[in-house]
């Protein structure tokens, strides 16, 4: 989809080869509107709500490009994943611009993106705006750092552009969703 979007031809973008490899090997499973991949985390996660040691296997969540993501889509996909991956700790992990703390300044909390984001506890941030810029301005014809010419067709584009023009950075965040994890019920 992205290659067709950017170049008007179907194909694979270089950055997608690593992801495609995991998809072909059957490591990533699409369930409803989301994609899931059991994956060991490469760091320990210490949050007030939970501690996860390094190499804990979680369900990595990928949000593929496509139609708008609704709350019902998210709940349905999570429920399917809980059944499909029965036996894996029901904690979802996501590394995405969709969890960026800067979204709090760009969007109203009632938006679909914020509804997705609110389920996640953020444990680390990456100062890499590439994914954020690529997804928010997919039609840009200018250099990634030429913020002045970025479109302002949506509330998100308008507000994120103002952050960039003020010298702020848009971050990618890593987070976990523990709302389906109930250790007292022995749900693993």
Protein language model features and the residues they cover:
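Non-catalytic substrate-recognition and accessory regions of acyl/acetyltransferase enzymes
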Residues: 1-69, 87-91, 105-188
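Conserved acetyl-CoA-binding loop-helix of GNAT-fold acetyltransferases
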Residues: 68-84, 92
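Conserved beta-strand-loop-alpha-helix junction that forms the acyl-donor binding cleft
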Residues: 92-103
């Amino acid at each position: 989809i992205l290659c067709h979007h950017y170049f008007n031809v179907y194909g694979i973008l270089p950055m997608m080869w690593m992801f495609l490899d995991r998809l072909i090997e059957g490591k990533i499973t699409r369930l409803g509107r989301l994609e899931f991949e059991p994956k060991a985390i490469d760091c320990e996660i210490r949050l007030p709500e939970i501690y996860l040691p390094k190499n804990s296997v979680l369900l990595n969540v990928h949000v593929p490009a496509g139609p708008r993501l609704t709350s019902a889509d998210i709940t349905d996909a999570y429920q399917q994943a809980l059944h499909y991956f029965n036996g894996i700790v029901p904690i979802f992990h996501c590394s995405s611009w969709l969890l960026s703390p800067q979204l709090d300044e760009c969007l109203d909390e009632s938006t679909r993106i914020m509804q997705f984001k609110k389920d996640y506890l953020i444990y680390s941030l990456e100062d890499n705006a590439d994914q954020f810029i690529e997804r928010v301005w997919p039609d840009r014809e200018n250099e990634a750092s030429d913020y002045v010419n970025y479109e302002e067709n949506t509330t998100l584009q308008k507000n994120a552009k103002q952050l960039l023009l003020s010298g702020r950075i848009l971050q990618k965040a890593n987070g976990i969703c523990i709302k389906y994890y109930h250790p007292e019920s022995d749900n693993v």
